[in-house]
Design a protein with these regions (language model features):
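Non-catalytic signal-transmission and effector/linker regions of two-component phosphorelay proteins
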Residues: 1-32, 133-148
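Active-site residues of response regulator receiver
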Residues: 80
Length: 148
């Protein structure tokens, strides 16, 4: 378990990976978290719910994300690299090539030291390496989704 999870602990399992709305209105910004590890998804859900008034939508599979993301209208995508059925690097390239998602901010989250992933993240300016402090993620989110 990485430093991030040890520090935060792990909250209950997310059974339904669909949309979670916590004190968020229908016009709140939508953050889509593409993460297959339920423990990490649970931590994201808990911490992002406490930290802001965003709508959260979880997708645990790369192919499902490829099919759903263009029509979700996400304001921000948090994209794990290690996904089943379609890896995050391939999904990233697909999303950047799609007219509905090409301008959506994507934060690439990885523990990998692979250069291609870092280059991909550096092109967007939005690469977050595990382990990270949750405040780092919040700072990125607040910069990309300023409150109105």
């Amino acid at each position: 378990m990485n430093r991030f999870l040890r520090r935060l602990g792990v909250v209950g399992d997310i059974k339904n990976k669909g949309e979670r709305v916590a004190e968020a209105s229908a016009n709140s910004k939508l953050i889509v978290i593409v993460e297959d590890d339920t423990r990490i998804a649970d931590v994201f859900a808990e911490m992002l719910t406490r930290a802001g008034r965003w709508r959260l939508h979880f997708i645990a599979d790369g192919q499902v994300a490829r099919d759903q993301l263009p029509d979700l209208g996400a304001d921000l995508i948090l994209l794990d690299v290690g996904l089943p059925s379609l890896d995050g690097a391939s999904l990233y390239r697909i999303l950047r090539g799609h007219n509905k998602t090409r301008n959506t901010p994507i934060v690439v989250i990885t523990a990998s030291h692979e250069w291609e992933l870092h280059r991909m993240g550096l092109q967007t300016g939005l690469l977050l390496r595990k382990p990270f402090k949750f405040q780092e993620l919040l700072d990125i989110i607040h910069a990309l989704l300023p409150e109105e």
